[in-house]
């Protein structure tokens, strides 16, 4: 579902890039065992084909769930997958990135604001985590230690203030 292979093989260069972005965005949902809705696949195709912008995808997703509120656990999971996929696709289309704590925090906030608790989205965690990943057959991703993120963030702030 949603791999957009026909666009990757036969599409124009812009379509190929958009299809790749959507494939990544949707594929990343599998880490949390989430599957996007058929509606997202449809509007993603509209974006790939140039009928709507990536911003309009997010707007249409928001309108869709306002009109059709998620009620079952599966619908809530689809809603989360749809919203985060649209945000990832937008992020991938920006062509900018810097490997820094500020960028990490900004990405996390833009992906999860309104989805995760306000205390979590865009915040550096203060505790270490291990999370069994379905896509890894129950193994965990090696997450960075919270203490390191806090230290790096503090050093960066200190450098910016003094520098």
Model regions and ranges:
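FIC/Doc superfamily catalytic core
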Residues: 1-163
